[in-house]
């Protein structure tokens, strides 16, 4: 991150009182930071909010410790905002890498609307950038969320104006066995349903979501199914996918891979699925 070519970057570093030597590294580069602190916090959202609340730049983003930007990303993002003064948020694509830095997948997104976000079309956080003015209107992260905290914020920012997808890879996100989105995968669904309940209390979102209510509910079950599958709870994932199918068939059928993977695991053929996935990862990373 410190090697980015764009000259006007405000670096804010929030460390949760790490004991792995991170503080010593931070002190080495402390002159590059507008602000830094190493202290205990009450979770990811609170830590990120500490940084967001101190940001002074017109464009704001955050990175978790496992993730990083690709070269020239900041310059490209700045140009997009300058060329599109009416947008409040922009997002690009993401490289998924393992703990060794090897590419395992390329996460390609599409142009989404507020209605798409209400139906849990998820945008990868590391490649998201937004205007500070929009953040000030939307508010900081809700600290009661731990898994879909970013999606909850995107919904609020998208109410402020246009969002734009740029089909370029801007960041890399590291996935490993200890990552939160795998270790506690079953919690994602609970927060998806919480967001649905929250939407009902937001007049502007209720109006935007009035035509997609069934699809949104089915999508929450689909999200639940996807992360239950990641968490190794295949039978629960299958039941969640079936609930999505009952509520809004097209939403469930668009993710038949969840159904197929869950079935393979339930009948004891999960190893076959894993072989296929490993082969796919080798192809993506260029290792035949």
Predicted regions and their residues:
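Conserved nucleotide-sugar donor-binding catalytic segment
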Residues: 53, 106-195
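Short aromatic/hydrophobic "clamp" motif used to bind/position activated sugar donors
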Residues: 60
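Acidic helix N-cap motif at the loop->helix transition within catalytic regions
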Residues: 20-28, 68, 72
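Conserved donor NDP-sugar-binding/catalytic core segment of glycosyltransferases
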Residues: 68, 72-104
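Short, acidic, metal-binding catalytic loop of nucleotide-sugar glycosyltransferases
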Residues: 1-8
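A conserved acidic beta->alpha catalytic loop
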Residues: 7, 15-24, 64
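C-terminal subregions of glycosyltransferases and related glycan-biosynthesis enzymes
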Residues: 151-152, 169-288
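Glycine-rich, basic loop-to-helix element that forms the pyrophosphate-binding segment
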Residues: 25, 39-55, 76
């Amino acid at each position: 991150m410190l090697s980015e070519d764009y000259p006007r970057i405000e670096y804010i570093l929030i460390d949760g009182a790490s004991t792995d030597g991170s503080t010593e590294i931070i002190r080495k580069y402390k002159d590059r930071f507008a602000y830094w602190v190493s202290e205990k916090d009450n979770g990811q959202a609170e830590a990120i909010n500490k940084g967001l609340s101190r940001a002074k730049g017109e464009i704001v983003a955050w990175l978790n410790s496992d993730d990083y930007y690709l070269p020239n990303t900041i310059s490209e993002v700045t140009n997009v905002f300058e060329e599109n003064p009416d947008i409040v948020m922009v997002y690009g694509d993401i490289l998924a890498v393992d703990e060794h830095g090897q590419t395992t997948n390329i996460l390609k997104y599409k142009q989404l609307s507020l209605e798409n976000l209400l139906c849990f079309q998820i945008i990868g956080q590391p490649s998201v950038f937004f205007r500070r003015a929009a953040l000030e209107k939307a508010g900081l992260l809700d600290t009661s969320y731990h898994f879909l905290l970013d999606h909850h914020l995107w919904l609020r920012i998208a109410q402020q104006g246009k969002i734009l997808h740029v089909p370029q890879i801007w960041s890399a996100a590291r996935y490993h066995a200890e990552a939160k989105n795998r270790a506690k995968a079953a919690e994602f669904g609970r927060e998806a349903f919480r967001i649905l309940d929250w939407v009902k209390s937001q007049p502007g979102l209720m109006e935007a979501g009035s035509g997609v209510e069934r699809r949104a509910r089915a999508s929450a079950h689909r999200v639940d199914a996807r992360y239950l599958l990641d968490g190794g709870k295949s039978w629960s994932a299958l039941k969640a996918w079936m609930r999505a199918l009952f509520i809004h068939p097209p939403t469930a059928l668009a993710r038949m891979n969840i159904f197929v993977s869950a079935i393979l695991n339930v009948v004891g053929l999960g190893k076959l699925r894993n072989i296929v996935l490993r082969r796919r990862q080798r192809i993506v990373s260029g290792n035949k």
